């Protein structure tokens, strides 16, 4: 019998392989402002939420450019690179295997919800999820609050739910919502940071030991 009845997935960095696109986006933004660029390793060591604090740490002047302006810049620049986006390895197979053993699957993302649904449809995996819940803004904020609203309307028992993410913040979200948590090391945070918060996997197909 499965240990969990529900899996709540993060999207960016967990199911979607967008770390390189994210770093390229930030480096273009930094370069236009004559700021120091980031390596992938530096990015994964430093990226976090709230995003405004991360932006400040890597050199953006939030007094000259408030979060709204930087967020618009990030979205438009990210979209230039988005044509190269793919799913992480084994995603369709892992999702199908979970469905076959009767576990319900959901997405909880900081991505704006309409964009999340568009991306799920473009990768033809939207039917694999019972519900996909995203943000109502472009600032990557409010993931815990969105999760709380999700729990209010869906028949999900937190104690029977595992969250799979790729950031320290995903572990914080899982804790706040009462979910179990496993973190994927191939996403937006370094493995050493993730290990301080939850069990980790280096490949999504290795998640099966947690069911």
PLM features per residue range, with description:
Residues 43, 125-141:
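A short, structured active-site edge motif that brings together acidic residues
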Residues 5-6, 143-171:
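Conserved Lys-Pro-Asp/Glu-containing loop-to-beta segment of HAD-superfamily phosphomonoesterases
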Residues 29, 50-64, 119-122, 150-151:
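Helix-loop "lid/cap" segments that line or gate small-molecule binding pockets
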Residues 79-107, 117, 144:
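Short, acidic loop-to-helix structural element flanking the phosphoryl-transfer center
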Residues 14, 109-111:
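Conserved phosphate-coupling serine/threonine residues in phosphotransfer and NTP-handling enzymes
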Residues 56-93:
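Metal-dependent phosphoesterase signature
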Residues 1-45:
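Active-site neighborhood of HAD-like aspartate-dependent phosphohydrolases
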Residues 162-201:
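Acidic, Mg2+-coordinating phosphoryl-transfer loop and its flanking beta/alpha structural elements
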């Amino acid at each position: 019998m499965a240990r969990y009845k529900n899996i709540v997935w993060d999207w960016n960095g967990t199911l979607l392989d967008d770390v390189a696109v994210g770093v390229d986006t930030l480096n273009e933004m930094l370069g236009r402002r004559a700021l120091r660029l980031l390596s992938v390793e530096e990015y994964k060591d430093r990226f976090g939420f709230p995003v405004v604090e991360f932006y400040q740490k890597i050199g953006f002047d939030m007094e000259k450019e408030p979060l709204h302006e930087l967020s618009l810049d990030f979205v438009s620049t990210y979209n230039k690179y988005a044509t190269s986006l793919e799913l992480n390895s084994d995603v369709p197979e892992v999702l199908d295997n979970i469905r076959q053993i009767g576990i319900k699957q959901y997405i909880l993302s900081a991505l704006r919800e309409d964009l999340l649904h568009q991306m799920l449809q473009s990768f033809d995996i939207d039917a694999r999820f019972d519900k996909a819940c995203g943000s109502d803004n472009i600032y990557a904020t409010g993931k815990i609050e969105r999760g709380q609203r999700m729990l209010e309307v869906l028949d999900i028992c937190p104690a029977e739910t595992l969250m799979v993410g790729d950031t320290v913040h995903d572990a914080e979200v899982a804790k706040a919502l009462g979910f179990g948590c496993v973190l994927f090391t191939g996403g937006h945070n370094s493995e050493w940071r993730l290990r301080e918060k939850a069990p980790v996997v280096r490949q999504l197909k290795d998640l099966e030991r947690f069911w």
